[in-house]
Amino acid sequence: MIDRYINNKINAIWNDQNRFDTWKLIQEKYVETLEELKIAEAGIAKKIRKAEVSKEEVYKQEKVTNHDLASFVDILQKKVGEGSNWVHYGLTSSDIVDSANSLLIIQSIEIAQELILDLLKELKLKAIKNKDTKIIGRTHGVYAEETFLGNIFGNWYLEIKRSLDRVERAKVSIAYGKLSGPVGNHTVVTEEMEKITLEKLGLKPEIFASQIAVSYTHLRAHETVG
C-alpha cells in the first residue's frame, strides 16, 4: 500500500513484532491455564511473560526451520528454560496463528470504529448546520426540486451508521479461536483447557475445527470492513 494511505495505528497492530508478541500472549495464557488446572508446575507462565522474543531472532531462526511459528517456539522455549516443555504443549501452529489473527483483526476493527464514529460526529454537525441550506435536488442526474443540504448529510449519516452496525456484528462474529490440536479433536488439549484460555483472551472456542479455525468468520470481517 502507498505510505500516505496507511493508518499508523492499524499498521502497528500488524507489525511482525506485535504479531509475535500476540503469539507469546496466547502461549502465556495457555500455560497459565495449565498451571491453574495443576497440569504444569507454577511459575512457567510468568517466565513466558518476562521473555522477550524479537522479530530479528525469529527471522534468523526461520532461515533454519523455514517455519515462522516453529522458529518463534524454539526461541521462546530456550528463553523459558526449565519447564519449557509446556510451551506449545499439545498445540498446532494454527492454534496460535488463527487465534492471534482473530485478536489482531478485532483490534484493527476497533480502530476503524473510532474513525467511523469521528466521521458520524462530523456528518451530524454538518446535517444540523445545513438543515436550512437550499440546494437543487436531482433525479436521474438532472435538476428536479429544491431540497436541503442538511438532508444530504443526514442520509450519509444513516448509511454510515448502518455500516458501523455491520462492523460491530463482524467484530462479534470473529471473536473466536481454537486450541484443539493438529486436527481439532482435543487429543491433548481438552475442551476445558481451550475454553478457559480463550476466555482470558476475550475469545470463544470454535464449535467445530480441523487443523485450522473456520476461515469464513475472518473472510466476513475482511469483507465488511473492506
Regions found by a protein language model. Name each.
Residues H218-G226:
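Single conserved hydrophobic/aromatic residue that forms the stacking wall/gate
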Residues M1-H186, T190-L198, P205:
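A helix-coil-helix interface module used to build multimeric assemblies
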